Amino acid sequence: MAAPVDLELKKAFTELQAKVIDTQQKVKLADVQIEQLNRTKKHAHLTDTEIMTLVDETNMYEGVGRMFILQSKEAIHNQLLEKQKIAEEKIKELEQKKSYLERSVKEAEDNIREMLMARRAQ
């Protein structure tokens, strides 16, 4: 009877190891994405701060692909605020995803510990 238990534990450990490796990769990817979104948010904030120092009637050019479009200061300001808001929302989503992944790995580890304790009690 010891052999089936060992096979079952071995299978559980290999599944856990695969899950941990996969989760670590996903967490690293989420960290990179969060870092990039923080840079985007900071860049938009700094640009907006500089724009707000200009006179209200100032027209500006927005780079779109290989051309520039003439827009008002207010339109550019609104676009930058929207960009910051979207970045913040995506950061929150990624943080939630990251915490979920970490929780799921911890639960899998706890399940294996529980299985080991049950086997030792027998």
UniProtKB/Swiss-Prot annotation:
N-acetylalanine found at: 2
GO molecular function: protein folding chaperone; unfolded protein binding
Swiss-Prot/TrEMBL keywords: Acetylation, Chaperone
InterPro entries linked: PFD_beta-like, Prefoldin
One Gene Ontology term from the biological process aspect of the record: protein folding
UniProt GO cellular component terms: cytoplasm; cytosol; prefoldin complex
Record text on subunit structure and interactions: Heterohexamer of two PFD-alpha type and four PFD-beta type subunits.
Family: Belongs to the prefoldin subunit beta family.
Its biological purpose: Binds specifically to cytosolic chaperonin (c-CPN) and transfers target proteins to it. Binds to nascent polypeptide chain and promotes folding in an environment in which there are many competing pathways for nonnative proteins.
Protein name: Prefoldin subunit 1
Naturally occurring in which organism (per UniProt): Bos taurus (Bovine)
